[in-house]
Design a protein with these regions (language model features):
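Hydrophobic alpha-helical transmembrane segments of multi-pass integral membrane proteins
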Residues: 10-15, 41-61, 81, 136-142, ...
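Helix-helix packing/entry segments at the starts of transmembrane helices
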Residues: 46, 87, 91, 105-112, ...
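Hydrophobic transmembrane alpha-helices of multi-pass small-molecule transport proteins
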Residues: 55, 120, 129-151, 204, ...
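Membrane-interface helix termini and inter-helical loops of multi-pass transporters
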Residues: 29-40, 67, 99, 148-159, ...
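Specific transmembrane alpha-helical segments of multi-pass solute transporters/efflux pumps
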Residues: 22, 27, 56-104, 109, ...
């Protein structure tokens, strides 16, 4: 049993690592696309439209024996709630935040997500809580606050507001990871994505329709590199990355999956600086150290005293 479980865990880890590489480029490509070629809500709508149509079409070709259990109304409602939090709400907040802050800041703030997962587990699932977890959560939040209030170099419109939006998006995503985990065990991943993406599409449609229709991306001739970057965002970052993240929950826990986000500030910053989208700043590594220190404290295990009876 253990030997078969290990390869499956490795598959889960590889899936999440793949999404980290995709997201490192995706955030930077979205920064290039916005707002010159398309506004934030318009980009979110296009992503959710591609996702919804894509997964509904794919689901039609899944054999009945591969679909596992048939979702009940309550299951569909919970999966759609997951879509509202983890796709629609998360993307609306994150992409609007990214539009007015730097990509490196976005990567650093996203690293607070494992801490949020633990904090929510304490609040919702009544997980164990101690002073180390309390100090760790405070340190993680301090790191997020530090990167948000420090001055920024480069063309950043309203970094603080953007950083706050990205933080709230991380809360939405953490809630989604906790909520959707049981449904990845019960139903085929494509079926789960089908209902989640439909809910996300319904949520973002009224926000993004006007922006999508008037976007220069579609009303004027866009350069080849812009079209390729859009293709990357829509196919790799929207369809494939979301599917891999969901599929990985079959093999690893939401907590383990969220830990991989600590790689993002490194891989993402390399891409950001290479593309000239943000200059290197010492504020970001300092904030990252605070967040990682908080994470380490949260995971500090209590020492168990062993009492030896000599009688």
């Amino acid at each position: 049993m253990e030997t078969t479980q290990k390869p499956k865990e490795i598959i889960g880890h590889l899936m999440v690592l793949s999404t980290i590489v995709i997201y490192s480029f995706n955030t930077n490509f979205m920064k290039i696309l916005m707002p010159e070629w398309i506004d934030p809500h318009g980009l979110v709508l296009i992503r959710c439209t591609v996702m919804a149509f894509g997964f509904w079409i794919i689901s039609l070709f899944i054999p009945a024996n591969k679909q596992q259990a048939k979702p009940k109304r309550k299951d569909i409602f919970m999966m759609m709630l997951g879509g509202l939090l983890g796709i629609g709400g998360n993307l609306l907040l994150y992409i609007n935040g990214l539009n007015i802050t730097g990509p490196v800041d976005a990567f650093v703030i996203r690293t607070v997500q494992p801490i949020i997962v633990i904090a929510l587990a304490v609040l919702i699932l009544h997980a164990d809580f101690n002073r180390y977890k309390a100090i760790g959560i405070v340190l993680g939040l301090a790191g997020t606050l530090y990167v948000s209030i420090t001055p920024h170099a480069g063309a950043v419109k309203d970094s603080f507001t953007g950083d706050v939006l990205i933080f709230v998006a991380s809360v939405f995503n953490a809630l989604y990871l906790i909520l959707i985990k049981p449904y990845t065990q019960k139903f085929n991943s494509v079926i789960v994505m089908r209902w989640m993406s439909l809910a996300a599409f319904i949520l973002v449609l009224p926000f993004g329709l006007h922006q999508a229709l008037k976007a220069p991306l579609f009303t004027s001739e866009a350069p080849v590199h812009i079209c390729l970057e859009l293709g990357f965002v829509l196919i790799l970052a929207t369809m494939i990355a979301y599917f891999l993240n969901l599929k990985a929950l079959l093999y690893i826990s939401p907590f383990v999956e969220s830990v991989y986000i600590y790689l993002l500030p490194i891989t993402g910053a390399i891409v950001s600086i290479s593309l000239g989208l943000q200059k290197f700043s010492w504020h970001d590594p300092i904030a990252l150290v605070l967040i990682i220190a908080g994470f380490a404290l949260i995971n500090k295990k209590k020492k168990v005293k062993v009492v030896i009876n000599k009688s």
